Amino acid sequence: MPQRNNLRWPQACMAGAILLSGIAWAEAQAANSPQTSILELGKELQVGDVVFIRIPKPPFTKVADTTSSWTNHVGIVSDISGKEPVIAESRVPVSGETSWSKFVQRSDNGRVAVTRLPVPLDKQQQSKLRAAVAARRGIIYDTGFDLHSKWQFCSRYVREVLDEAAGVKLGEVENFSTLLKHNPQADQTFWKVWYFGNIPWQRETVTPASLLQDGRMRVVFDGQAD
């Protein structure tokens, strides 16, 4: 099974078809979501908070559609000691850390959600989290979304970092067969193109949606920040 490791022309050819639905989605969200400023929301963040956004381009929009969720990207707060919080994430092309404002500004129409463990991370757990982040810095983004590959993708990254810091494995591990069975509306044509005509049905993965839906976390904010 070939691994996807770069965004190539088949994905780009589908961008136009996805754009219109993305615009409609953004307009609907603007009318229905709580609003705050990026600055004010940033003041509330704690190390270990999990932050969800929506990147408005494929394949990420298709990830959201396939999981029946608005979110398609996730990061974790790794530092709050500077001028603004820092978000650790697995991103294209390699994993790293991003300022809070830049992270949220990448989201479609400023859509963002923040979830938190019931008990804040203690100093030892925060130190473990930063060590887990450092160990994953510079790892290539896995566009094959394989939970067991040598690379990383966003939800796997956050799941592993929080597990190493606090012993909490967020989200539900699913194979592609189960995931698409639970979401029959998913565009299988897109995924067949994405995987060169052969969807890896038994491949295990974990999605941003399953991390957001994890009942062990409490929602700190779910709306728009600008």
Language-model features: where?
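Intrinsically disordered, low-complexity regions enriched in Ser/Pro/Gly/Gln/His and often acidic
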Residues: 1-3, 18, 93
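Bacterial N-terminal signal peptides that target proteins for export
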Residues: 2-14
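Bacterial N-terminal signal peptides
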Residues: 12-22
